[in-house]
Amino acid sequence: MAEIITQEDLLIVLQHASNPILKLNIEVLDSEGKIIGNLECGIQSGSMSINGQSDIRRTANFVVQPTLKEKIKLTENSLLWLNKDIRMSVGLYNPRTKDYKYYPLGCYVYTDTSGTYDTTTDNLTINCADFMKKLDGTKNGQLGALIISYPAYKENEETGEVIEYNIIRNAVIETLEKLARITNHRIDDIGEFYAMPEYNDAWEQYREENADTWNTIPFDQEFSAGCSVLSILITFRDLYPNYEMFFDMESNTFICQMVPSCYEDDIYIDNSFLQRVLISENTTVDMTTVRNICEVWGKVIEVDFYSEECTYTNNIYSSTIPGYENEYFNGDSIGIKIPSANLDNAQISINDFGVIGIFNEANDEPIKANTLKPNEIYAFKIKKKRVDKQDVVKAYLLGQWQVHAINVLTNGKKSGKFVTSSDGEEYELYSKEYFQKFYNCERVDFTIIANSPFVVEKLGEIPDIKVSGEFENITSNDLAADRAKWENWKNCRLTDNITITTALLPFLDVNKKVSYKRSDSDREHQYIISSISHDFASYTTTITMYRFYPLYEMILKEKGTHKVLSEFSHGVLSKYTHEELAAIVSGDEL
């Protein structure tokens, strides 16, 4: 995949659209990644697929005609055997230089016996997939008769005091290097939303103040015998939403990173070029996959200490917890039955250790009035931070006994309609109070995309309920709300898509921004490539791409980035002029 497409690349593609001349280069690698042979083949047929939504990102199959027949025997010492890997590239002939320009297709492992040779047609069939197959148990990666544990922290065996919290990124690196023997990797930080520079201008300050917790394993992780290396890696990846893992095509580096937002990315390929190589267009939408509400049920919260003895006076919850001694300890989780609803900036005091504030984990802001409901059990996590060389203790609200959050895709307009609940109360349809009541969920967030065809106001409620499995790793309502927003965004963006077929474009990759004007529209829009399929027999590329809807609100007028409203609050709306809001609602770019 070329990071920058040159004019030469575009000219070669345009020339090949009418008279394609291709050559496949296969380098055979040993277990150390060293080249031990080379097969230059003429392509009879074959295909390659790249799917940004799949753990196995790249697969390929080829029917080729080798030039050196002695290298294709299926024997232990041949170039096509179980212990061999291959690195492939495809060459397009450049009439100007009278030579081939090669584009990398990545490194692969054989997924069947290794290949079949047909003496009648003199053809070789190769089926393969990327190196994730070495981690998922297909070729390697299944672990033997042992239980693997990753504790959340190390503690003093005598006192039980926490010595060190274990970091998610370090656990991923340890898994790769010790269990898979992969040292060629690039692992980015995995952690809390507000600790990421993509989402918070003050991310460095947040990391400093939450040094012990922002990127640490939230609870002990244990994996049974027979699991795969990939299943362990996925568990750590999915502790927080919006991360991906894959092997890149250039150097076969294992990469773990946030899914690119593409906010500030330049257009990789523009509409004018795509129109010149366009063959067909398909805008079919699979309505069975459309969802506009995501409801996430997370972890059933297990607390270290619990008490039903609690009073509420002067906006302070005072509780006595037997066995909780001496002082607040960093990382302790506490369950308390709340006697009364709270006012703004509520505080808590346990065993007279001192009054501390109650905060939301997602934004580090004090909880708002009526966040805590009477006679409900809530869990809090104690966190100590170093601020100006002093310890600052806060209680972070994890949620009720089971983590629960909802995200709703809406156009942000009031319905003006009312429905009556079983207890006789009226609620405005699709209001926050409506969803809180009828979904029995306190944490309800809205994603507002004014021009989406899939909002609840247009299609009604189509829920996507996430429960069990990886969602049991979500440890607070705030984290569940982040995950619900991410899942709902995927649901709406992946259904608002288009598939086009073009002349062969071997330099493409997923998560790239392009501009394109649909045949039934008079305007260009920005899209993100989600999957690619190359057909080397017909010399075509099929591209599936989804409409670019930013996940989080951001103003980048100087970048020309398409804008939508992602939060429905006065504070956000006040950032825009009346003309800008009109442009956003109509789908224009700022």
Task: Report residues per predicted region.
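Acidic, low-complexity/disordered segments
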Residues: M1-K23, T119, I126, Q142-L143, ...
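Beta-strand-rich assembly/attachment modules of structural machines
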Residues: A2-Y165
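Short alpha-helix capping/helix-loop boundary micro-motifs
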Residues: N61-N77, S319-I321, N360-K368, D496-L504
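Acidic, glycine/polar-enriched metal-coordinating patches/loops
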Residues: A341-Q400
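Exposed extracellular interaction/assembly regions and N-terminal maturation sites
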Residues: D304-G354, R386-Q390
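Charged- and aromatic-enriched interaction segments used to assemble
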Residues: D118-M287, S586-L590
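Short coil-to-beta-strand transition motifs
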Residues: K98-Y108, N375, K517-I528
